Amino acid sequence: MRIVFMGTGDIAIPAFRSLIRHSDLAGLVTQPDRPVGRHQVLTAPAIKNIAREAGIPVLQPHSLRSPDALSNLRRLNPDLIVVMAYGQILSQEVIDMAPMGCINAHASLLPRHRGAACIQSAIKSGDAETGITIMHIVRKLDAGDIIAQISTPLEGSETGGTLHDKLARMTPDVLLPVIHSIEKGTATRIRQQEILATYAPKLLRADGKIDWTRPAEEIGRMIRAYDPWPGTFTNYWNRKKRIRNMKIFPGFSILPEAEGKPGQVLSAGEQGLLIACGSGGLLVTDVQLEGSTRMNISQLIAGHPNLKDIHFDV
């Protein structure tokens, strides 16, 4: 069974490597090389380099809707198309191209957290578990029939980054058996319950602004979920009465008994910066001021002795 893999994000790499080892991989479709960094160096997706090393043909169309892109994809003659973190919405023509189907590996337990920010959303929502879903692709976002799922508990210490890596490692454990069942004609199809669907749209940097009127527990989940992307930040007024920005990183503690006006600095010491929330307080230990580098609270206090007078915007 000839398989074409479509993927760009690093979360897709373990699945792609497993297909190189255990299947007849006809090709990789990934996003075009992009300018990266301050100097805008044209950089290939990491998965492209892996494919090249393995001698796998690579397609990088700007749009899979163009006649040339569709023609090149047909020439790979796929029996099955497998998608994970590709980055383009597929047309019905692509979905129907492979006779054995077009399936997707999605990093949540569907129908919960449909969309691009599924990993962050599971942490931010305080879910007890999350996982990987293998499903048939349909035109509606992440709404296709489920073939299989694998789950993992959320322990309350994960960040968006650590959970991303864990789910990436888990994917081959559910994907390979699904592919074998499709080849044998024994794959199951379970319709998603629309009434249970939730959505996790793509995040922007502005989504990381902290609302200090929210409970400390909720803000803490947001900080963990949005690390490393899009990050969390808060604004404050400096001595020159200009609004400044401060990023906040995981490494905090939650103090349920703390009381104060949301955004108020209750204390500033070696243990951290205690900020009042809508309920409870957040003891922050690692921050980054606008135009500076990441630092601990001791370093922050050394350069800003009047932290107690700061009030963060809600």
Curated annotation (Swiss-Prot):
Record protein name field: Methionyl-tRNA formyltransferase
The organism of origin for this protein: Akkermansia muciniphila (strain ATCC BAA-835 / DSM 22959 / JCM 33894 / BCRC 81048 / CCUG 64013 / CIP 107961 / Muc)
Gene: fmt
GO cellular-component term (any): cytosol
Gene3D superfamilies hit by this protein: Formyl transferase, C-terminal domain, Formyl transferase, N-terminal domain
Domain of life per record: Bacteria
Pfam family, one: Formyl_trans_C
Listed PANTHER family: METHIONYL-TRNA FORMYLTRANSFERASE, METHIONYL-TRNA FORMYLTRANSFERASE, MITOCHONDRIAL
Cross-referenced CDD domains: FMT_core_Met-tRNA-FMT_N (cd08646), Met_tRNA_FMT_C (cd08704)
Key words of the record: Protein biosynthesis, Transferase
Class in the EC hierarchy, top level: transferase
Keyword Transferase: yes
Recorded GO MF terms: methionyl-tRNA formyltransferase activity
Protein function: Attaches a formyl group to the free amino group of methionyl-tRNA(fMet). The formyl group appears to play a dual role in the initiator identity of N-formylmethionyl-tRNA by promoting its recognition by IF2 and preventing the misappropriation of this tRNA by the elongation apparatus.
Reactions performed catalytically: L-methionyl-tRNA(fMet) + (6R)-10-formyltetrahydrofolate = N-formyl-L-methionyl-tRNA(fMet) + (6S)-5,6,7,8-tetrahydrofolate + H(+)
Family membership noted in the UniProt record: Belongs to the Fmt family.
EC number(s) on file: 2.1.2.9
Residues that coordinate or bind (6S)-5,6,7,8-tetrahydrofolate: 108-111
